[in-house]
Amino acid sequence: MASQPAVSALSAYRQVLRATRIAFQNDTRVLLAARQEARQNFEKHRRYGVDTPMQINHALEVASILRHNIVQGARDAEDENAKWELRIHDEIERGDNDSIKVAGKKVKVDKPCSS
């Protein structure tokens, strides 16, 4: 019975690592820090306990947030007047303020983020 949560924990850990790769692509410093944080949290809760299912669920939620809600911006460090460029990938959740009022439904975006 104890082997089933271990498989789920491993699956959750892999999902977190995949999500960090997507969210922090081309930002090695942040990518390594996020992966180190994930590893430390999983190591801290290595033994199966009463709260293991909650910890696994938390890891899956973190992976979802990283994958769907984190957008990184970058600009030329030498030019203070340079515009920020956002790296919006295919899995980013898009919508406008009116879409917040539509609970539980997918929002179809029919326009690009930058006009």
UniProtKB/Swiss-Prot annotation:
UniProt cross-references to InterPro entries, sorted A to Z: Complex1_LYR_dom, Complex1_LYR_LYRM7, MZM1/LYRM7
UniProt keyword Mitochondrion present: yes
Keywords: Chaperone, Mitochondrion, Transit peptide
Annotated GO CC locations: mitochondrial matrix
Family, as annotated: Belongs to the complex I LYR family. MZM1 subfamily.
Function, in words: Assembly factor required for Rieske Fe-S protein RIP1 incorporation into the cytochrome b-c1 (CIII) complex. Functions as a chaperone, binding to this subunit within the mitochondrial matrix and stabilizing it prior to its translocation and insertion into the late CIII dimeric intermediate within the mitochondrial inner membrane. Modulates the mitochondrial matrix zinc pool.
Protein name: Mitochondrial zinc maintenance protein 1, mitochondrial
